[in-house]
């Protein structure tokens, strides 16, 4: 059973209303309501948009919006949306909507994925987070449903996200998009500061805006909470997280015990020993598959599309919103407490009992695979459940 939290997380920060959407049905209803309320424009970007009941309903709402004169633009990642039939999107195009696909599969930029998730309506309201357009992300029932988060934003911060979408859309639609131009777009739109700031990441070596920001926040923090569906960062990042405890602070990690990709679970378990040795508390979420991406460093909250692994930190296109507000951070930490209550703690003794030679070998191999391959590729590699 999933433990709910109270009161609801619905805050105003710097003139922006922020409302957390932890429930799948709540996400679905909010998405449809937001699309149906659009008057001028709808910008949609998703890594995965599937041709199931949820995807069909969302496409219908977008098609209706286009038919009533709303400018609708949809940007999808070809690898994540590879199962969609071209004819599925025809009604949207016929109604006057537009769409394009990020990154042809056969390309010298094969490893880069547009892993972002966002809906921007009228340049004023937005939905961001980790959930894709798929029936298992937009429900709270069934063995295949995902535990995830979206954040609804209503306020001036959305205008910057709309501008970012426009630049990414134009870059994707260009017949010969250059990676160096993409890097400039990411850097340009990550320059803001203040209580609410956007941080993006992509194929940028050592100056990737979101990783740079989250490292800075971790190094300054006395308390860090990480809820990450996929967790396989570098040894340097593990040392930084452990350093929070070593200097007298607290650090918790909540990651998945269930997934449709067993390699990602094994890869996370490869990191546990280093974290536990430094005093980090580690938990595995039990009731459902976990897909959340939430990071809290003292009063700074990071929420968006990025996992805490190599691909999200240094390769994929990702978007994160950084909110620095004490009350909001405490509310989000209370939310994490609820996730911890539904998790099993992996103590040093528990980890030691599981860390057989065979398992450690499998964990190490999985860590290598998820670092070098796309999620949809490693999902097809059957390493078996433990």
Label the predicted regions.
Residues 1-386:
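Charged, low-complexity intrinsically disordered terminal segments
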């Amino acid at each position: 059973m999933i433990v709910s939290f109270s009161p609801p997380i619905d805050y105003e920060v710097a003139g922006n209303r922020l409302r957390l959407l932890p429930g799948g049905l709540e996400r679905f209803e909010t998405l449809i309501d937001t699309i149906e309320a659009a008057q001028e424009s709808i910008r949609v970007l998703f890594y995965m948009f599937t041709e199931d009941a949820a995807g069909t309903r969302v496409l219908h709402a977008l098609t209706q919006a286009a038919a009533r004169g709303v400018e609708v633009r949809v940007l999808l990642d070809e690898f994540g949306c590879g199962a969609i039939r071209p004819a599925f999107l025809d009604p949207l195009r016929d109604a006057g909507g537009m769409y394009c696909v990020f990154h042809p599969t056969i390309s010298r930029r094969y490893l880069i994925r547009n892993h972002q998730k966002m809906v921007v309506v009228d340049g004023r309201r937005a939905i961001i987070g980790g959930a894709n357009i798929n029936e298992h992300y937009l429900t709270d029932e069934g063995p295949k449903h995902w535990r995830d988060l979206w954040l609804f934003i209503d306020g001036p911060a959305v205008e910057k996200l709309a501008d970012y979408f426009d630049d990414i859309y134009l870059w994707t639609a260009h017949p010969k998009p250059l990676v160096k131009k993409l890097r400039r777009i990411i850097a340009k739109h990550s320059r803001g500061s203040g209580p609410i700031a956007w941080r993006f990441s992509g194929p940028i070596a050592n100056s990737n805006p979101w990783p740079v920001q989250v490292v800075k926040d971790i190094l300054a923090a006395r308390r860090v909470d990480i809820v990450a569906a996929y967790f396989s960062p570098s040894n340097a990042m593990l040392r930084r997280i452990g350093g929070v405890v070593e200097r007298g602070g607290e650090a918790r990690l909540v990651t998945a015990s269930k997934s449709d990709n067993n390699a990602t679970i094994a890869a996370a378990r490869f990191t546990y020993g280093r974290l536990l040795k430094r005093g980090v508390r580690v938990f595995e979420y039990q009731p459902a598959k976990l897909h959340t991406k939430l990071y809290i460093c003292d009063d700074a909250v990071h929420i968006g599309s990025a996992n805490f692994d190599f691909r999200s930190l240094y390769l994929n296109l990702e978007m994160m919103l950084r909110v620095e507000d004490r009350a909001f951070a405490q509310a989000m930490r209370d939310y994490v407490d609820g996730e911890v209550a539904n998790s099993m703690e992996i103590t040093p003794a528990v980890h030691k009992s599981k860390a057989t030679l065979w398992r450690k070998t499998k964990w190490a191999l999985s860590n290598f695979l998820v670092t070098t391959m796309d999620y949809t590729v490693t999902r097809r590699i059957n390493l078996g459940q433990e």
